[in-house]
Regions:
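PDZ-domain C-terminal substructure recognizer with occasional recognition of PDZ-binding tails
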Residues: 211, 217, 233-265
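Glycine-rich flap/beta-hairpin and adjacent strands of clan AA aspartyl proteases
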Residues: 1-5, 84-154
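Pepsin-like aspartyl protease folds
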Residues: 1-25, 54-73, 100-103, 233
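Aspartyl protease active-site motif detector
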Residues: 12-60, 111, 198, 202
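Terminal peptide-recognition signature
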Residues: 77, 111, 148, 205, ...
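PDZ/PDZ-like domain segments forming the peptide/carboxylate-binding groove
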Residues: 154-218, 222
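Short, Lys/Arg- and Gly-enriched loop/turn segments at beta-strand edges
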Residues: 223-231, 256
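C-terminal, low-ordered peptide segments at domain boundaries
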Residues: 99-100, 143, 147-149, 159, ...
Length: 265
């Protein structure tokens, strides 16, 4: 059970963090909609330091535009009796934090990558948050090792060929009773379009020549529109040196791209 503070109709809790010389208590927004583990606003205090080993990164989109900053691993974050070591933490830059909720003593956000490890009950009436570890609790904190940020760019009609099967052992017959071999039909379905909207500087994706607005056709032999964005994201968070083979559409041409996932943190 954790004390929950409601400020401007938003929930906050206190966590202990160490990113620098000292451990400090930080008030953070509880944000299940944020896919990262932890955000800290280093520019609002001199106690929190950005780790020396970090990468510049696109952190997300807010109401006022894109949010950029850095990612690094801090020594730990403590949530009551639960401790997360070497947790991947995002540090929005000062320009981005100007447009983020300016609660005076807010130091960041705790996001979905931590919260998904718990069963959660929000008791707003009694200002309490109940957390209980679930099956995800011991999972490693992962991050994108490709340098790609993908987004859903709407839908498109796709023609697919399907085999027409008869009722007996796959046999198909025409109107005269003659057997038809290799019978196919075609159907049109609306499928998702995935495009690249950011390529991290000095990443494997940048080195391989991938560009903003490239449309993803396939990844490791799987047609992109048959996958969810979450499934693709998980592939790009795979182990060091995993080979990624993409086919992208650029200016009407299909381009094959191959690179390896690279650990940068």
């Amino acid at each position: 059970k954790f004390p929950l503070k409601i400020i401007n109709e938003k929930p906050y809790i206190d966590v202990l963090v160490k990113s620098g010389k000292s451990e400090t208590l930080a008030k953070v927004l509880v944000d299940n909609g944020n896919s990262d583990a932890l955000w800290l606003f280093a520019n609002r205090t001199n106690i929190i330091e950005i780790p020396s080993k970090n990468i510049p990164d696109f952190l997300g989109r807010g109401f006022s535009g894109n949010i950029y900053g850095k990612k690094g691993r801090i020594e730990y974050m403590k949530l009551g009796k639960y401790e997360f070591k070497n947790i991947i933490t995002s540090f929005p830059d000062s320009v981005s934090t100007q447009n983020i909720n300016n609660t005076i003593d807010r130091w960041g956000s705790i996001g979905g990558e931590v919260l998904r490890r718990f069963y959660q009950i929000f008791d707003y009436k009694n200002n309490a948050l109940y957390l209980k570890p679930n099956k995800n609790f011991e999972q490693e904190f992962l991050y994108d090792k490709s340098g790609l940020e993908l987004q859903h760019e709407g839908m498109e009609w796709v023609e697919e060929r399907i085999e027409v099967r008869g009722h007996y052992k796959g046999e198909v017959f025409d109107g005269t009773g003659e057997k038809i071999t290799n019978s196919f039909a075609y159907k049109f379905d609306l499928k998702p379009i995935y495009k690249i909207f950011n390529v991290r500087t000095s990443s494997s994706a940048e080195a391989a020549g991938l560009k903003v607005n490239d449309q993803l056709i396939s990844i490791n032999g799987k047609i992109a529109y048959k996958m969810s964005l979450d499934q693709i994201t998980k592939l790009l968070r795979g182990p060091e040196d995993k080979i990624i083979k993409l086919e992208v559409l650029r200016d009407g041409k299909a381009i094959p791209i191959r690179f390896r996932l690279r650990t940068m943190l």
